Regions:
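Active/ligand-binding-proximal structured segments within catalytic/core domains
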Residues: 147-161
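Short, solvent-exposed amphipathic alpha-helical segments in soluble enzyme
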Residues: 94-98, 155, 213
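An aromatic/glycine/proline-enriched structural segment found at the starts
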Residues: 42, 77-135, 139-141, 302-304
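Long, His/Glu/Asp-enriched segments that create or flank divalent metal/ion-associated functional microenvironments
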Residues: 166
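M16 family metallopeptidases and their MPP-like homologs
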Residues: 1, 10-21, 27-54, 73-81, ...
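Mature hydrolase/peptidase catalytic cores and their serpin-fold inhibitory cores, especially
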Residues: 178, 278-285
């Protein structure tokens, strides 16, 4: 039985409307909207909520959707990790999990949210009290990615962090830091994504943008510096060892085996040692040559 609380819902709605109104007045909101449009066009699920959207929320419909999602638990997967007594938890699972309704039907994802293919470049200006420029670069490549390749992309991510710290932050003094994130997704389709984000002074973006691409191009052409790769491996090994005591780490490994069919844990350290500069070079080339580049640049201009 779903517990209802109309007053709590109304209070939540009011808080959300105030928050959404504040977002409307934030210059960064225009940047986020532009990134979403570049990546997903006008996909309704990726559309930013507005005050009008919150005002139209239907509490009864929300409860109905909630009940529908738990009406058939046949294809649910449950994972329990941590310091638990298996004998003590078994009756709880029998009481709260095993009693969930289940039928023979299985659901399939029919409307996946996919990043649009092709190149997209969006540059625009926004009035600001304190002008700054924000840059977001994304590229992705579809295709199956093995557990070892996942580790290769993890090392490339770390190498790029070091490269951009040296070239963009220290040599150019153009930003506090460049954020890079390379992630491997298995669902809804296998793909690897690279996202690069930084903020800088509006007068420096023309200098810094080419450096971002040039540094990735150098790795794709010549491979990473030996010291960068070594540091990336050392950090990956240390992180791997440190994470062994974290529940979240083991939960991720269960997800890997349950949904993706591979066990990165079994060969992590041996795979790590086998990765060469050529592997990193190939990964960089894959991302650099992918035709799905998205570049969004918001240039702040003074409204004084």
């Amino acid at each position: 039985q779903v517990k209802t609380d109309t007053l709590a819902f109304q209070a939540y709605s009011q808080r959300m409307q105030v928050f959404m109104q504040q977002l409307e007045n934030d210059p960064f909101t225009a940047f986020q909207d532009s990134v979403n449009m570049a990546l997903y066009q006008a996909h309704p699920i990726k559309k930013r909520l507005t005050v009008a959207d919150v005002q139209q929320l239907d509490y009864a419909k929300a409860l109905q959707i909630y009940q529908q999602r738990f009406a058939n638990a046949a294809d649910f997967s449950f994972a329990v990790v941590g310091n638990v007594d298996l004998d003590a938890i078994e009756p709880l699972l029998e009481q709260y999990v095993a009693t969930l309704p289940a039928q023979q039907d299985r659901e399939k994802l029919t409307h996946p949210i996919l990043t649009i293919s092709g190149k997209k470049t969006v540059h625009f200006t926004t009035d600001m009290v304190q002008p700054k420029t924000t840059v977001y670069i994304c590229n992705y490549k579809t295709g199956a990615v093995s557990s070892k390749q996942t580790l290769v992309y993890k090392l490339l991510d770390a190498v790029l962090d070091m490269v951009y710290t040296e070239s963009v932050r220290e040599e150019q003094g153009g930003t506090y830091g460049v954020s890079t994130n390379i992630s491997v997704n298995q669902l809804p389709i296998p793909a690897v994504y690279m996202a690069i984000h930084f903020q800088t002074d509006s007068t420096k973006v023309a200098t810094l943008l080419p450096i971002i691409y040039d540094e990735l191009g150098k790795i794709a052409t010549k491979g990473p510096k030996a010291e960068h790769l070594q540091k990336a491996k050392e950090y990956a090994k240390k992180t791997y060892i440190d994470q062994q005591i974290n529940n979240g780490y083991w939960l991720d490994r269960l997800v890997d085996t349950q949904f993706y069919g591979y066990d990165i844990q079994a060969s992590y350290l041996s795979d790590l040692e086998k990765i060469t500069a050529k592997d990193i070079q190939k990964a960089a080339k894959t991302l650099l040559n992918s035709p799905n580049l998205k570049e969004v640049v918001q240039v702040g201009v003074s409204n004084k």
